[in-house]
Amino acid sequence: MKFANLNLIYITKQKAFTIIELLVVVAIIGILAAVGVVAYSGYTKSAKKKVTEANHKVIAKYIQNELAKCLIGESKILDYNGSKQFDCNGTHNSRGNIPGYIEKIFNDKIQDVYEPSTAAMTVGGPIKCHGIPKSYGYKKLGYQGKHSISINVGYTIIIIETCVEDSGSPVKTDISIE
């Protein structure tokens, strides 16, 4: 026997991932990341729309509540920095100032979720939602996230319009003053 004196040496095979296995794992991680980014983007877009709709409702409720104060006997409403802005017993034409007061009050309280550095509300209307670039200035009506307030010619209806989408018709609420 020629091999009788040989000491048997066991060579253990090192365990490691092959390059193919590593590439498969990296590809799977990449796919999961891509799906996650798309899902997150959709989630934030939906959240911004919901916040814009909620802000519209808050503005409408605030105006309704303030006008109700006039009906129960308060003489002044629309508090801005500790000062009441509107005289309930004032002239019919003084109602034309209400949109300006509301604009001041809410530009201090809410933000445009799409462009936080610009005012969320402006006086004007009627509006149609469109895709004007933000660089046109914050006073331009009709782009997503903006709220518009106006009053009809007879000073009897306050109109709030909000662009929730970047195109189409705005969400609109009419509030009777009388």
Predicted ranges, named:
Residues 9-11, 25-26, 35, 81, ...:
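Low-complexity, intrinsically disordered/propeptide-like segments
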Residues 1-17:
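N-terminal leader/signal peptides at the extreme start of proteins
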Residues 2-4, 52-53, 61, 90, ...:
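Intrinsic disorder/low-complexity signature
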Residues 68-178:
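Periplasmic/extracellular, small/polar-rich flexible segments of pilin-like filament-forming proteins
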Residues 13-44:
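N-terminal single-pass transmembrane signal-anchor helix
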Residues 45-74:
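Membrane-proximal N-terminal amphipathic helix
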